Amino acid sequence: VSRPIKFRVWDKQKKEWFPIKNAMCLILNTESTDLCFMTKQGPYPIPQTVQEDGGLNRYVLEQFTGLLDSEGREIYEGDIVSVIYPEYQAAKVFYCPHSASFRLLSKNVALPMITMRTVEGQNAKLIPIFNEVLGNVHKNPELLS
């Protein structure tokens, strides 16, 4: 099963989403020190004035998980979602390199985003343990407290 590889970009200085959709990666040209986001349409250069004021550390790239919430919204790293299993709680989506998977962090416990569950009289099936995107760690950090 494949999923689209795409990112969204948070500008930490301006505290807003960088005005580009579906960034696939951030590229640094080491010869000219120019930064650009690579998109399906080609490179999207970052203005030199932006580069001089923070460079790579200014941006947070958050990858699409390939999953949608109950409202059909895409779920990205950094999103805060409502967890419905084993109990209702808010959790942050993050990428875990050790398991090479997206996970949920709630109350300092890492949870899988999908679990196997058997409903009486039916075969076991994969089900999401989240319901909907509540916000994200940049604009709504209070949702995790």
Regions from the PLM with identified roles:
Residues 1-145:
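Secondary-structure transition motif
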